Amino acid sequence: MLGHAVNYGSHRTRRSFSRIKEVLKLPNLTDVQTQSYKWFLNEGIREMFDDIMPISDFSGKLSLEFVDYKLLKPKYTLEEARDHDANYSAPLHVTLKLTNHETGEIKTQDVFFGEFPLMTDSGTFVINGAERVIVSQLVRSPGVYYHSDFDKNGRQIFGATVIPNRGAWLEYETDAKDLAYVRIDRTRKLPLTVLIRALGFGSDSEIADMFGESDSIRFTLEKDIHKNPADSRVAEALKDIYERLRPGEPKTTDSSRSLLYARFFDPRRYDLAPVGRYKINKKLSLKNRLLRQTLAETLADPDTGEIIAKKGDVVTHELLDKLSPYLDRDDFKMVTYEPSKEGVLPDPVTVQEIKVYSKVDPERVVKLMSNGHIADDVKHLTPADVLASINYFFDLQDNIGTTDDIDHLGNRRIRRVGELLQNQFRIGLARMERVVRERMSIQDISTVTPQQLINIRPVVASVKEFFGSSQLSQFMDQNNPLGELTHKRRMSALGPGGLSRDRAGYEVRDVHYTHYGRLCPIETPEGPNIGLINSLATYAIVNKYGFIETPYRRVSWDTHKVTDKIDYLTADVEDNYIIAGANARLNEDGSFKDKIVLARHKEDNLEVTPDKIDYMDVIPKQVVSVTSACIPFLENDDSNRALMGANHQRQAVPLINPHAPIVGTGMEYRAAHDSGDALVAKAPGVVEYVDANEIRIRRDDDTLDKYVLEKFRRSNATKNYNQTPAVKQGERVVADEVIADGPAMENGELALGQNPIIAFLTWNMYNYEDAVMISERMVKDDVYTSIHIEDYESEARDTKLGPEEITREIPNVGEDALKDLDEEGIVRIGAEVQDGDILVGKVTPKGVTELSAEERLLHAIFGEKAREVRDTSLRVPHGGGGIVQNVQVFTREAGDELPPGVNKMVRVYIVQKRKIQVGDKMSGRHGNKGTIALVCPEEDMPYLPDGRPVDICLNPMGVPSRMNIGQVLELHLGIAAKQLGIHVATPVFDGASEDDMWNMVREAGIGKDGKTVLYDGRTGEPFHNRVSVGIMYYLKLTHMVDDKIHARSIGPYSLVTQQPLGGKAQFGGQRFGEMEVWALEAYGAAYTLQEILTYKSDDVVGRVKAYEAIVKGERIPKPGVPESFRVLVKELQSLGLDIKVLDMDHKEIELRDMDDDSNDHFNIDTLSKLAEQQEKKKLAEEAAKKDDKPDEPVDESDSSTSSDDKVSK
């Protein structure tokens, strides 16, 4: 028998074809969310308060300090928050201490800091009743970056940027003449020496001594001349910088000094964050710069004087290891520079320096200067950082040091939910700090308390804004468990502080070699976001600095054998090693079988001997994301189709009776388990009781655990969220085992679709262009039937004319329309409703004009009843019919929180059972998508020799050009596994080979070619050629024809243009665009075109008259002026252009006169006739004044009434 048996949970065994043993368990797949939030609650909040506090007033008499914080019990449980459209959050209380330094009095008080949203166990937040996910952001890490380029003359120019987490950027650059410049905060450039002088090193000799005598320094010093002899060089430099940053303002040495200090050296204004300090120390440290350099001085032990390295030695890895402990010391090669007292900071600057030879001119000595040993908690820049970064910049011109690749994952980091939240909270606290300072100055010092100083509104507002409207706070994709899991593991380069879609180029979107084992190279959206939104690889974790690490097996340096010791490496650390692939063949003892092994180093693929290898991949699937790891035979698919296959799985609709794939990858169990949709046992025990609603498990220590199952809840994607028990009474369970399946699960495994019998066969052109033909059995047996739940809300509000009322007494509605409503006017649960049926009867008071005497009398006798009301009932929208599943009524009396002005709210859930039908979209796992073109009767389907009809026919033309051969291999392996009655697992890059597949086919006793004779169901004749028939996992996707089909007869119009609205959501019409107009013009269908552009569109008066004429059975009158013509005229008039409509004789026609003619004789085409009439009318009026008898018949149309008035009448 091929393969080996592997258990997934206690209910499913698969035959696995993997050859590589699993040395590392998959980490929890939602850890990227939950661990980060845990950090925020435990450390992040405290860190933030410590940054902002203590807050002192301007005189220093009062100070407010942070003591502690605590989160209390949530107001609502998770379920209540969902039902009440509320937040799942807990009150945050902070203990603050107010000290009066004059009297020594201390007041400590507990202050409420607002409700703080809590994360659910599965890594989501419930905000306003809906589950949301905070997507992690991929951003450029703070630090110092160097780059080089070539100008148009082919000269190499260099640049450097110091990027903080918060604060001003510092940029260095050279030009074609080798002059070095600096830009501070994106302003105009200055000679770089100006910045050095401003730090307190004013003379040319000091600068030359510090940075050496390179051409670049010499030229820059020559350009940077002393312009104002009244000022010292340091003062002049400070003023030059001030002028660049604040042009036009009066400059003094003091103001210039404080401005430069505030920009870079003030911890409150400038923040590198721990990661920025780590990156800068790493980049500038001599440990990382000495390798392969030739020493220009002899290095000795400072204590013993023993020589460690001689002048002229080249620093190898071994020598560097020997030097490392000395480089970490505070007394080895340290140099202290004394700045002038006029400089920004008067303190001495200590750096570590070692002399080496230039790579460009081997005779010249160059200094390597590091920033000394700056502590990790110094979050602002120091003068030592600036000097060392300038030294690195000049060293690059001597070919010492390396430039940085911005797309390298060592230079991009992840901001996870905890950090994003902390940043947002910090903004709120900073706003609050300003308010506290102001209140400290105003309030009476003796009586003030912390509570009176604090205003929590800015803090609450910033948190609310982040969860409600940030680009990274997204409505969770709840189509199926896989979509949910992927959403939590998503990495977005967009969002505040990230990239924007339009500005992102190809480089940042492209797959980088550092993505290996960190970000999936396959799963990314198609369209404008391609490459900007990625998915975390299966085994990747995020370290404390936010860099992605991936695990590798360590190879022993002595024995060159692969050990089971696992190291997690970041991308920049990995660059130092040579790494073998996971499929390198090993002996039992862990040594490499082959003399030459395929390995990677940076972006190169090498063939090396085993003694050169440092690490080995853990497992092949560490390269891809969870979704891609669910595609069997991924290695046989073209990458573009694999991308579609990964995305389609997330769009699969949970079915009524799902089945896990016969051909899986072994990833299905973990994906379902970690998604948060399955119910998992907390502890081992025995199942004591099971029904559809709850499971009770008796633990080994005799305590009883009760698990309540979710039943028929509406998910975010309007799908049915339902849990079903996966265990039986008396069954033994272990901790962390799946005991109840969520949606799209079977036996604890992900089950997104079904395993139908599929034939690659064209059938009467019904498979043309990727169309799919399915058997009627799929409909009859509910194979692809899914349940969808939609909710509709109706609110009874207070209006100006009185309150709305939810009632059964609706005007002008027959009794048959009310048959399913209860006495309150709310539909009963279980009622079957069609489009347009009333769900909630509601009446709204009409505007009442002055009442007549009779009405007043009736009013006095019968009270409110005689008031006129209009029907504003909630009705089933088009395509929304189904069965009423649940009704929720919220009222103030019952203690429910309702928005202001709302007295009662009713929510009705309608459930639909959707069978598969023509127009629905289906897909496999290999990007082989198509829509259903025909549901064929079972008896007409092609059938196998044993009489079984196939379920689905796919077009064989869809395979060769698309190069997704994985589907063909899956097809053959699937039918073999089905015949043998087993499930198989073929993990990605380590699964069944083609030979394995054919051996399995042979074992199952299927023909040598894997094909079969197929018979035509209508004639009984065999098809000419043998056909590939097998079992392939096939999904029904969320793009269903029921959601897309749309038709309009009459409906709403746009207010301004009076044209029908567009789109299904607005119940709009289809736009008759210019191309459609050309088509009718080409046919000469003038009248058809005229009515489309007038009555059926935006001729307001014309459509009312046409309606009247149809009702009365009269001739339809001629159309009037389309409203959009008026809009055009008004638009042009609003621009100050005097637009008039003229007739043939250049006489003006008034627009409103073109609208109406009581006898309907006038025609819009004969504008000149109208002008004649107007002329005659004037003459007639003049004649009437002279003598009482008119000469001409006067047209008595009401030209004074505008069309709007008529419509309202």
Curated annotation (Swiss-Prot):
Name this polypeptide is given: DNA-directed RNA polymerase subunit beta
Molecular function (Gene Ontology), one example: DNA binding
UniProt-listed InterPro entries: DNA-dir_RNA_pol_bsu_ext_1_sf, DNA-dir_RNA_pol_bsu_external_1, DNA-dir_RNA_pol_su2, DNA-dir_RNAP_su2_dom, DNA-dir_RNAP_su2_hyb_sf, RNA_pol_bsu_bac, RNA_pol_bsu_CS, RNA_pol_bsu_protrusion
Protein purpose: DNA-dependent RNA polymerase catalyzes the transcription of DNA into RNA using the four ribonucleoside triphosphates as substrates.
Any one GO CC term of the record: DNA-directed RNA polymerase complex
Species whose genome carries this gene: Lactobacillus johnsonii (strain CNCM I-12250 / La1 / NCC 533)
Keyword Cytoplasm carried by entry: no
Domain of life: Bacteria
Family: Belongs to the RNA polymerase beta chain family.
Coiled coil region boundaries: none
Record keyword Transferase present: yes
Catalytic activity: RNA(n) + a ribonucleoside 5'-triphosphate = RNA(n+1) + diphosphate
